[in-house]
Amino acid sequence: MVTIRLQRGGAKKRPFYQVVVADARFARDGRFIERVGFFNPLAAGQAEKVNLDLERIQHWVGQGASLSDRVAKLVKDASKAA
């Protein structure tokens, strides 16, 4: 099953997440099929907090991919703002 989920990066105590399309069997920070955005929970000032390619996300959902809970919330907020 294909899932759209967060992949953690960044440093210790400074998380940065890539939003990726990955097979559910792959490790959280392992292989992925496509990167469709990022989420920076510690963004300050003018830094961009969320950047999502909503068109590609809709494509993958149409192909049967499921969204993780956190990504579903990010997509909902991003589509509301757009």
From Swiss-Prot:
<protein>
    <recommendedName>
        <fullName>Small ribosomal subunit protein bS16</fullName>
    </recommendedName>
</protein>
<dbReference type="GO" id="GO:0006412">
    <property type="term" value="P:translation"/>
</dbReference>
<comment type="similarity">
    <text>Belongs to the bacterial ribosomal protein bS16 family.</text>
</comment>
<dbReference type="InterPro" id="IPR000307">
    <property type="entry name" value="Ribosomal_bS16"/>
</dbReference>
<keyword id="KW-0689">Ribosomal protein</keyword>
<dbReference type="Pfam" id="PF00886">
    <property type="entry name" value="Ribosomal_S16"/>
</dbReference>
<dbReference type="GO" id="GO:0003735">
    <property type="term" value="F:structural constituent of ribosome"/>
</dbReference>
<dbReference type="InterPro" id="IPR023803">
    <property type="entry name" value="Ribosomal_bS16_dom_sf"/>
</dbReference>
<dbReference type="GO" id="GO:0015935">
    <property type="term" value="C:small ribosomal subunit"/>
</dbReference>
<dbReference type="GO" id="GO:0005737">
    <property type="term" value="C:cytoplasm"/>
</dbReference>
<keyword id="KW-0687">Ribonucleoprotein</keyword>
